Design a protein with these regions (language model features):
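Donor nucleotide-sugar binding/catalytic pocket of nucleotide-sugar-dependent glycosyltransferases
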Residues: 1, 6-21
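A donor-sugar binding/catalytic signature common to diverse glycosyltransferases
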Residues: 106-145
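C-terminal alpha-helical cap of glycosyltransferases
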Residues: 191-210
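Donor-nucleotide binding loops and adjacent catalytic segments primarily
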Residues: 27-29, 34-110
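Short, conserved active-site loop motifs that form the nucleotide-linked donor/cofactor pocket
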Residues: 10, 94-96, 154-156
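Short, glycine/polar-rich helix-capping loops at beta-to-alpha or helix-loop-helix junctions
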Residues: 1, 81-86, 122, 141-147
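Conserved donor-nucleotide binding/catalytic region of nucleotide-linked donor-dependent transferases
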Residues: 26, 157, 162-163, 170-187, ...
Length: 210
């Protein structure tokens, strides 16, 4: 390679994530545990720790456009500024705003689709769960390449404005068959946990199968 490392010494494993993301969860049980109505069509919005992008404008537009059975859940993580900003949207019946939570896997199980930046970790976690994704506000470099990969193979979608993103969410929530197809494609393409494979290589000297 350009850095002088022989090609045969490089092993592509994928990004390691916790095994729980590769463990299928029950949507009905997760919704019951999280207090999410069983009949809702749920969009989960996660913006990463930096809270980049038009998160507040997108959340506002989605709450205005979602059908009666639609619901938006926003997880802000440790971004207190974003959390406080979203609370300014007021008490909207189709919006739930959370700060940090350890229940991200359960929220992914409960959701119908997820909006997120195409960062490596979040997208890998969602892909392992088979959760269809819509990407927002990609940053150049690795995020741009992630977006290109996912969209090229129809594993995720994106749009270039708040209005188009909101419309895309509503369109997908109204098409369960399309969401099932995307979910199945993700599960087929993200079967292996990079963390397990890395441990196998380090402890057993075994190369990852391709």
């Amino acid at each position: 390679t350009r850095c002088g490392i022989p090609k045969e010494r490089l092993i592509a494993t994928g990004i390691p994530v916790r095994q729980i993301f590769f463990t299928p969860g029950s949507r009905s049980e997760s919704r019951a545990a999280l207090g999410i109505p069983a009949d809702k069509r749920v969009a989960l919005l996660m913006s990463g720790s930096m809270g980049c992008g038009p998160i507040k404008r997108l959340a506002r537009r989605l709450t205005e456009m979602l059908p009666e059975e639609g619901m938006l859940i926003v997880i802000c993580g440790h971004n207190e500024k974003l959390y406080e900003s979203l609370l300014e949207l007021g008490n909207r019946s189709n919006l739930r705003v959370l700060g940090f939570t350890k229940e991200v896997p359960a929220y992914m199980d409960a959701a119908d689709l997820m909006l997120t930046k195409p960062g490596g970790l979040s997208s890998t976690e969602a892909a392992a769960k088979g959760l269809p994704m819509i990407f927002i506000d990609a940053v150049g470099g690795c995020e741009g390449r992630n977006l290109e990969f996912y969209t090229r193979y129809e594993l995720a979608e994106t749009a270039d404005s708040v209005n188009r993103l909101a419309k895309l969410v509503c369109t997908n929530l109204a098409d369960p068959e399309k969401l099932r197809s995307m979910s199945q494609a993700l599960r087929v393409n993200f079967r292996h946990n990079g963390g397990v494979e890395i441990c196998d290589v380090l402890t057993k000297g075994r190369r990852v199968s391709t």
